């Protein structure tokens, strides 16, 4: 016994490839196959990275010999393919712009996925540049997640994740008149903002009742609070731990009796339509994140945010030039620049 550890190599697959095609597909392959490495003088090149399917996917893409079974790859293998992309310095656009990518995403049936599955797919949707799918899934995660929103990488390559400006491990919220200030990541900030809007919509009428001069306001306020209790909003501290969507879904339970002496102002605020209006406004508030707004607002090479991003706000055309239609909240939360820049823009906008 020498005390030295021994290793046994086992070949688990063979791929027949063109050395010329591989060399032309990436500088790393070119250096290893045409340079002074041992592989350049051999007809067999050992590969120690990736998975069987992730490597096969790349080899088929660069050789342009796709087969249908590649469109049914597991999410984990696509993560591995993205990792291989960095390892071999393959241009990821070869993957994202391929016909394979579109068909693979179509087969994911992303609209039918649960939130956990969406949290595994959003990173791929961003890396492979699927704006509609990314927007839809980020919207669903913001409305449907009760706890901190995370992207879930199912592989050991945990460096493959969304940028911290999109999802951060920890978020700290501070409320301003119109928005949660940009102290949280985009998705969790948008989620917190929805909850603030729900609270504001539900409890603003309480302050209005108190300011009225009518004699019926006391009885009307009591009935309004009873109506809110039917939705399960109380106890508030436990109910607000639910997702925004779970809270909004309880609005259908709002119902209150009308005091016999109630004036028309009180009757209006006691009507189902007041709660329904709040529910509709919050439900339609956030469209999800926009990849195009994210791209144009992310500073490049130390430069400031592209002027085209701020122009959206100036012109009130928030999805101008974007591949998906959206409103102002999506534009705001898709901002990838420095927080101080957005804060300064919001202050200037309110002058």
What residue spans do the PLM features occupy?
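Canonical BTB/POZ domain core
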Residues: 2-110, 203-252
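Acidic, serine/threonine- and proline-rich low-complexity regulatory tracts
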Residues: 98-101, 105-351
